[in-house]
Amino acid sequence: QSIALFLPDRAVLIEEWADIPLSEYLSKIEEIAPRILECRETPRYLAHTATLRATFALTHFSDARVFLLDHLCKQENKIGPHFQRPIATGGLRFVLPESNDHIGNLTVIIESFRHGRNEIFVEVKGVFGREPVAADSIGVILENTQSVRAFISERIFPYLEQFDHPKDLFS
């Protein structure tokens, strides 16, 4: 479902539980982003965010919690005794600040997917405020959204893939 949410200080475009190509989502942004500026009588966006989510199925692990917490983070038998309850989901969170070489602050969440035992849920939120974006330069928002998607496929997937091997390879 497509949602446009208008708040006093921001507009949020959401494609929730959507299996659409990124190009289709970018077309929606390209269409509505200039209109929002016009309706609000605002010359530019001072900042924008792009949040993209994906899931990855594991090849050699049937439980994403075991993969992330026990295998990747080496927490086997170290969590339960302290928290004394089962873990529904668990994972990692990284905050990657903007630099001269990389535009935008990225918040990366990698966790077990509660709807699929052997799947990893990934969310990357990019916050871009380096340059204001006017109606005639909406392409900047599209490029930054594409860069968030590229980060998932070119950085996170290979990062996880290096650990998704049979356990005996690491013993």
Regions inferred by a protein language model and the residue ranges of each:
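N-terminal low-complexity, intrinsically disordered segments
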Residues: 1-16
